[in-house]
Amino acid sequence: FRFEREPGKMDPGEAYRLSDVDLASRLSFFLWGTPPDAELLEIAAEGDLSDKELERQTRRMLADPRSEALGTRFAGLWLRLQDLYKNRPDPNFYPNFDENLADAMRRETELFFYNLVREDKSFLEFFSADYTFVNERLARHYGIPGVSGNHFRRVTYSDDRRRGLLGQGSVLVLTSLANRTSPVLRGKWVMEVLLGSPPPPPPPGVPDLDETGTVSGGKFLTTRERMELHRANPVCNSCHSMMDPIGLALDNFDVTGSWRLRENGNPLDTRGDFYDGTPVSTPAELVNALLGRPIPLVRNFTENLMAFALGRRV
């Protein structure tokens, strides 16, 4: 719980001006998750928190290590990182996935976001960055050599398989099921969390994908083949035609975020068309398609950041 000063005896919906002290409190809880420090309180108490001084204080606070709270608090809420622990990969299929790896994946995303804030990077680098932050456990999982110890450090990728947020294990695990990837969940997550355009719920009576046959003609079906059977229902096709290509472009990442080329012994077919018609078949192509239309990404991020700062929806 946290307690903040608010003016009393206000009518619902009535606009009012925050005092400098109240503004300082809101700013500090937003950026640091703590009450204001002595410098900010002193300036606020003297009534000197003008627009120019407010900007100076904001920059000072963002440069302070306490602003890492934005990574652990805001990024965690916005990206739903808590879901990383809700549906663990099945140990019968993925015995190397454990609590330490899950924690490292979450920490990677928190540090990645905080680095963009600290270095005042473009928000779009959140998706295009050719680097990330790993410790030895996570580097080994990603196949990145030369990293030892529990300390997280910045590393540069050697190819374009992983780029930015969509190549990070946290997102790939929380959008998977325990025993298989889910292009539907991954596509839905991108639409809902990153683009701010959640698809409608499925119509009643439509069977789950897991109820679709897994074997045909004596061979195991890939997730894509089962999805094609599933969305043959015209009621489902309108939404799935938008979600599925997004998720399929990420299907080279397995349940734990490791890179793969086959599923059930069959080569993966990840080809699809982004909602604007752009062909996408790899994570890099998906990122390029998203960045080709950056306004929805920026608008949705801004709305989520404002909601976090205000403590309410906007």
Annotate each PLM feature:
Residues 1-309:
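Active-site substrate-binding loop specific to GH73 endo-beta-N-acetylglucosaminidase modules
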